[in-house]
């Protein structure tokens, strides 16, 4: 037996350089000797003076031992300690009388200290090696092996972990002993237990170790046993708090340890003490690790031990006053986690009912936190509560109103999470019990009306019953009073009988009252239920209006969430969802993806597929096709021009993805063909109510609109329905329904493929002749219906697309329409007769045709030019290939003979052809001897310049349009007629004419830039036209011209800037978009800022607040410091020359709002108006 002093050995080990320990000559032999000794009994560790020292030397030399010897040594010590612990525990538990084992305690103590020291030495060396390995390798705990070095490190890590597990297992056996019986004083016991806990806390600093589940389990169990059974709560608390402050990866570990302590060892005190300490801790402003680690810990603890955390929540909540956003976020998230965990069990929820209510209230308060991340955590906490099966109906109602309010938050993160919360609230709404899950407001209002009327009728019935009861009782009393005293016996008997009768009546009344009370209560509850539902639906309606505006957010994730919400709202049959879904249609033009790579347009297709291309499972193929066709038609009904353009793009994409099949197209054609049948029924039997109910006019229009859109993606669709188009749309039905005729013309035009040329024919000559004849007829047809003009425009477009000789046909058209308008009939039944019709209407139609033919001729000539260039390139390429291949003369002759046209092109100079086309446009179309268009120039000028004489509004509109289109043909005519058009744009009382004049001037700016550029001031004036439509038209026109580079931006940007504060939201939004786009073009805002500022500052009609609002917006685009500095210098120069207080104030406002600051400028501004007065 040797004298072993634990403190001495421990101090020596901690202060000695570990590399200085002597190497053993033959460690294997010495280890085998010790193994033999300890095999007899673990108490043989110090049987001889040399055995203990030999074992200690082996442990000190542990790093230099072979892997095999290391494993043997660690196993020997761990197994010996385990066996010793078992023996001691057995003796302590079996011997009740302490005096019997009192003599053994000093020996046990010495042996435990010896083994404890050896364990600590091994733990220290192992944790050093693990730390070294983990710092060298990146592949620990992973299957991938990037190199041989990593592979060796992984193997070493696993071996060390296995040895560590053996040692830790022996420690758990040791800690099962009641050490207080062996170590008489607390310092002795603490020193002994510290042999194990200190190395373990150092070991925990190695992150890969905490990912080995078996090691983590042993460490947590050891620490828990030390706390519970051996009074180490204070020291372990201190170590845990240190770890929490410096090591992020230990947040989850510590939370799991505290859960183990609470669940298996029934020791929640440590958790509570740690939470108390956290709540009072003050963090350094520069410290980011500490708050983050504490936050992760609180969040994990709230998930694992919500009950314990709830008890200390009053202290934890104080962290909400902390400046650290991370800590505030964690507290808010913890609140949500606690409620979510506790509310899963009904009994627990009932027990913590009040505390849960307080936490929910806290979450609601945090919706108004100053930081968006904290607000987001509050929203996410509410989302977790909404996922629960427990009913929080009152809370959900509050969540709904808060979420709707948060949709207007400045942070896109908050808005996106608000949309998610609303989706959950809608998905799990509590109003499904009686009338199903649908939430159509009109239906619920009807339910409420029904219940209220039922309640009123029930109340009246109850009142009438009460009155009857009072009457019966009163009559009985009166009869008793009037009884004669002489008839006492009879009276008593009668009284008895009457009392019995009265008792029976009272019982019936009580039953009736009980029934009435139950009915009344039920009705009142129903009314409350309906009112709550209606309130919820109205909140959802508000949210839809706001979410519809989020569809065009710059944040792609927000857009996708908004789309999904609108689809969900439609599934619940909420009326207003249609508004959002229609608005969603315009996202088809949006490019880009979200963080996960989801394309906006692809997601839009998925949404519309779910909404409109998915039929009930119970339907057969024909029914599904009909369902989809009707849905598509409904999309077109009531749609604006912008809606139809977006729908056309979307349907094209859907068709390309084969989401719309031939069955649907067949149904659409069937609906379109029903127009003929409906027309015949109407003519034959107008009042026959028994006739089969057909499709409405809107549905028939919708069918051909959709078919026209699909034909753009696949021209075969229109080609296959050509006969129907000619017989119905361009036949008798179309003549009576010009809208149907218009869209039929559009579909007819689209049977020509998009990539076709003017030479390629889409249909054979016979079908072309029929189609052209029909188009010709509907164009010259006289009607007073104003739908004629859009129909005529489409018909002429189709004519120029389909016909192989559109110029000749157009000439004939104009001649015949002219004869119809001005000519005299040769016969009474002549087709040209206009006996009962207005020549003014006919003239309006004629001028419209002339103008449209002028533009279409111009387009036709440009197509000819483009086709010439294309075929010339093809000819040159072909000839070059023939020469290179050395083809024989015979083949070359045959090729050239087969394509004489190409030969002609090959011999023509490209510039000559372009000049010829330009000559035709400039001189022949309007000024040629045989020019039919030129004949109308004087007529149009006369009508436009004499509006008092030709006062018909439609005639004036068509004449102005015609003038504009003729001006686009020739720069000569444009220059001549430009003053007339500007006069009309300035002075016409008709806003439609002024709008058309603005558009015409825009077109001319593209065609003849040099002519219009000098007169753009007149165009900019219309930005402040008294009519809103003219303002919008002008803003769109100028926006296009500037962004496309068609006009030079001079001093007119100031006029554009004034539109930023326009009362009309649409105009101000459009103007914002313009400046946003302009800012991306070569510092355009910076270059034009001084001119804009001068314009705004000198405008006395512009309010002070409006000026500030506009300037603030524009300054956001000047973000380069160099530009800010230069602008600052320019404005300071102006500041010194100011003559009025207003000028000085305006410049000072800009300088104060510029991010660039200068001390001289600040001093100058502080002097204020003194500078001005000195000048004066």
UniProtKB/Swiss-Prot annotation:
InterPro entries reported in the protein's UniProt record: ARM-like (IPR011989), ARM-type_fold (IPR016024), CND1/NCAPD3 (IPR026971), Cnd1_C (IPR032682), Condensin_cplx_su1 (IPR007673), Condensin_cplx_su1_N (IPR024324)
UniProt entry keywords in alphabetical sequence: Cell cycle, Cell division, Chromosome, DNA condensation, Mitosis, Nucleus, Phosphoprotein, Repeat
Places the protein is found: Nucleus; Chromosome
Principal location listed in the UniProt entry: nucleus
Single GO MF annotation: histone binding
One term under GO cellular component: condensin complex
Gene3D superfamilies with a match to the protein in the record: Leucine-rich Repeat Variant
Residues carrying Phosphoserine: 464, 475
Pfam families given in the database record: Cnd1, Cnd1_N
GO biological process: cell division; chromosome condensation; maintenance of rDNA; meiotic chromosome condensation; meiotic chromosome separation; mitotic chromosome condensation; mitotic sister chromatid segregation; negative regulation of meiotic DNA double-strand break formation
Oligomeric and partner information: Component of the condensin complex, which contains the SMC2 and SMC4 heterodimer, and three non SMC subunits that probably regulate the complex: BRN1, YCS4 and YCG1/YCS5.
Family: Belongs to the CND1 (condensin subunit 1) family.
Function, as annotated: Regulatory subunit of the condensin complex, a complex required for conversion of interphase chromatin into mitotic-like condense chromosomes. The condensin complex probably introduces positive supercoils into relaxed DNA in the presence of type I topoisomerases and converts nicked DNA into positive knotted forms in the presence of type II topoisomerases. The condensin complex probably also plays a role during interphase.
Stated name of the protein: Condensin complex subunit 1
Source organism of the structure: Saccharomyces cerevisiae (strain ATCC 204508 / S288c) (Baker's yeast)
